């Protein structure tokens, strides 16, 4: 990717955001919010929660002096009930907006309505696939001002697809799956140095592998 998820909050800090409120950064899933907070903290040579922390359901890793707050979009949506103008934030980053969940759609609609009341609030919407011009026009209609749109190219790597021989359906049980993974890894390890990324259908299969 382009690095937008981990670099944008740090860039926002560099240009002076996060001084009058938190830099809020939403993710569709809890595991993404926690792992990104850890990654940003690592890059900034700090403990999780000191500069960048996270808040998810039942867990809050954010110290009083922190600047960047990772959270699920559901957490930010819940905060609108007690902080209707989101005054705790001076910058909000809505990441992965293309997922178009109910929470994200509600948030985008809500933020559009409060922006005229919060001219100091900066809203950043990021995605790998959304129609940026359409989103820009949607928010331009609020303040009657041009909304900047930035396209950043990601990195593409060559991919070679190879298939292992098809197995008999009668043999297609969990042990066969594990054996197929082991065989594929053996073949790849014999082809030279590199990393192996395995996709499996469920959590149980991942843990067993």
Which residue stretches match the model-derived regions?
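P-loop NTPase motor module signature
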Residues: 1-209
């Amino acid at each position: 990717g382009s690095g937008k998820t981990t670099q944008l909050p740090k860039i926002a800090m560099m240009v002076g955001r996060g001084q009058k409120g938190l830099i809020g950064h939403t993710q569709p899933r809890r595991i993404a919010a926690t792992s990104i907070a850890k990654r940003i903290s690592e890059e900034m040579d700090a403990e999780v929660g000191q500069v960048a922390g996270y808040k998810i359901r039942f867990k809050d890793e954010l110290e009083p002096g922190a600047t960047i707050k990772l959270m699920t979009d559901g957490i930010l949506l819940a905060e609108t009930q007690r902080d209707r103008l989101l005054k705790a934030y001076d910058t909000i980053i809505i990441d992965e907006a293309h997922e178009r969940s109910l929470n994200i759609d509600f948030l985008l609609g809500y933020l559009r309505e409060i922006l005229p009341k919060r001219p100091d609030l900066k809203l950043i919407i990021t995605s790998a696939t959304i129609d940026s011009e359409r989103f820009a026009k949607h928010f331009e209609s609020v303040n009657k001002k041009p909304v900047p749109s930035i396209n950043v190219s990601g990195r593409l790597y060559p991919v070679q697809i190879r298939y292992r021989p098809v197995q008999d359906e009668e043999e297609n049980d969990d042990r066969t799956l594990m054996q197929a993974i082991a065989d594929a890894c053996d073949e790849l390890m014999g082809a030279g140095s590199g990393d192996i990324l395995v996709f499996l259908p469920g959590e149980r299969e991942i843990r067993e592998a």
